[in-house]
Swiss-Prot record:
The keyword Transmembrane helix does not apply. InterPro entries: HSV_PRIM (IPR033685). GO terms for cellular component: host cell nucleus. It comes from the Viruses. This is DNA primase. Keywords: DNA replication, Host nucleus, Metal-binding, Transferase, Zinc, Zinc-finger. Essential component of the helicase/primase complex. Unwinds the DNA at the replication forks and generates single-stranded DNA for both leading and lagging strand synthesis. The primase initiates primer synthesis and thereby produces large amount of short RNA primers on the lagging strand that the polymerase elongates using dNTPs. It comes from Alcelaphine herpesvirus 1 (strain C500) (AlHV-1).
Amino acid sequence: MTRVVKALFAADTDCAELLADILTGQNNSGSLYCLLHNCRPEDVSWEVTRLSLCLPVRRPGGAEGRCAEVFKIKLPTEEAGQFLFNCGSLSAKQVYESYSKRAAYETFQPILEVLGLSGDEYSIKNAVTWGRGKFVASLRKYFKLTTSPHWFINTFGAFENHFVLVSSCYYFFPVSVSTVDTLCHLAMLYSSKKGCPLSSITTLRELGAVATQSPALDRVENFYLYVCDKLARDTLECEAVDRCINEFRGQLMLSDQDLVHYIYLSFFQCFNNQKFLAYSQCTNPCNLNTTMLREPMLVANIDSDFKHKMATYYNKNTYLSNYVLLRGIHLHPVVGYGQECLRSAHATGGHSIWWGESHQVSDMLKTINVEYPDICLHEEFRGLMDLAAITDRCSIFGNPIHYLTDCATSGAIPIYRSELSHRHYFLAVFSDDIEYFWKKTIFLPPESFCLGAQDTMLTRAITYTEMHCSMSSVAEQIHVSRHEYFNPKLPVFNWVLDLDLPISEGNLHIDSIYSLCLLIRESVLDILKLLGPVEPDHEVFFFKSACINLCDPGEASWRPSTFCTCTEKLGMRVVTRFPPGICLKGSEPLTQLTKILNRVIKLGCGSLLNLSAFQLSNGPFDVGIYGRGRSIRLPHTYKVGKCGQLERLLKLFVCHPEATDKFPYLQNSLKLNRLLHHAQSQDPRGPLKIIYRVEDINEDFLYKHTQKQLPVKHEAVIPSIERLLDTSLNCFLLSKVWPKCFGTIRSYMSEEKLQQFSRVVFHPTNHCIVQVRPDRGNNFKCLRYNHRGSSKSVRVFLILHLKEETKLIVTFMSQCFANKCQSNKAMAHFSVFVDLS
């Protein structure tokens, strides 16, 4: 039985019209010639040769469909040899007389059915005749009917041997996982002899003459076998790399950004330029058989040090022990808020406060600066914070604190903010009765009930006397709503945390919230242990923001009982004191410590991923509340709404699993010295260790490691040029850059617009942009159009870009305000190259 020979053909006329004429039996003077085939002369040895004439498909659905059979014909061996090997042509009449009608039916019937021209094998001629226009248009869309050889040359290679190997393997020996680019790369590995260049070829017939007689045809089958073996080895290597990366990342809790960086770095270590070239050398035809016997090679390139850092940095225990740096110093004495400022002066309540609005604060500070010229306070809120932080002042002018109070204080004064009637009041409190107020309005369960009771039961047992409207005076309002200001000049004894956690779904069960609190408590204690000794029953207070009512109380009877009805986010305040003898100083240590807590929680949140997407954010706790001028609402207080209503009461959520008797925990949650940043609840006598530096020494490890692998960016271009050439920028632009720019401008710009650039000056605006101005004036006329009015409002500037240390690319750009020029959008006109060497 004769072997079917595949041949890719082209026509010397419109190919789509030629196909339609052949199918309908119309006279056509055109002819077909061979571009490429899959046989050797010895394969055409029978009396009759069966030819499958094919065309490339524009959008192949798979490897098997890259070229589609158009006609199946039988030719005498001599005619077939002339067509395949000697640039012979087949006339349209020859094809019409010898093509298989059944094969043509199988090829074109699907197209005719889509066009609504369906017919059986005997009516295909009539169908094409009646719908010729649609049929020809469909052929142009389905097949790649190019008339130029340049598409083939640009796609499959510009040299004879590589072109024949790649195109023959692509069309006649389909490999499902290969692309043209892959085959081109493998052809370079397979044969270093590229053959004659194809750049002089101008017609498809010339290209076919070269390809059908090329000696590379004898090597196509061997090349195909090499491609199969090479791709099998590549698949083995890639699967090993993927398996290593996936197994490793499955053990780590990574954010989306960290995950992208980790995968990028892992693949970069395996497939960077040097490693990939070395692997390519090991898998060339000479070495492939030996390499096939070895274990996967590329996966071994993943650096062991990188693996170690990943394994330790993204592990909770090793992260805290290896990557958290603390620096502290012992000092004596260290004073926070005065103790008298945190309690009432009378057993029955009552407080002593100073309050005022921002303008009153400013007026007072101006007066103080006049009377006490050595104090130099800022005459704004910052000055009030500095004044409140004064604990002991030795000056001949005295102490300006008497402007706030005549009471003697043993420490700093707490500064609060309270809102009433859409006004914000700043308060300095010298004696505070809020604990007395809390005892009257918050009812704790009896001590006997607290023995052995579950935390969730205690949470439900606490009763608040809820209020709904703002008070009538500031003195009363600070009982129900106040914010404490963080003072960077004071030591921090209590770690106050603000949790704002987006939740995946609403109506949280109390057990879900309790599990979250347990995770936070464990993470907080792990970090506190780095600072000093911490007991297992160390108190960590949680205050959950009350939910907003979703309906009127009368309509809520039919709704299922749910502890939390929050739908978008869960708000909580978390407060704990630092270990005995430890405090922090300044904003930066608190910020860094909170960042570390966020990371620890993300590393241990595997069981709570259904509650919130922890990995999508930087962490659940706000790190911005420790800056100067930042305040945070006290526990057991309300948020004031837009209309003065009181909402979002911060209620105690009990989480104290290590203690049997939890009544002291409940009582301490009502003590002011346990809830404020700078309040000291322990014996103030004796030296304290002040932590002044907290650092994650490997912070943004993956991001920084990724940046190191990226190409170096030369950002400080102008200083680099001046340093390299030892000359001023102006001299360099006038002597080297502007002559090239002006020559380019002169070649395409009219004489009228060219005159604007006869005398120019240069004004650098940053490290890589230089504005070009006329010698007189600031701007130019539009360089593209003649706008109505023709005002000089166009800015021109040069963008300097260092491609390498000695290769400078200068881009000439302009900005025109006219609508026709897209309203001040920067427009690039041209670029010139300047060699700095």
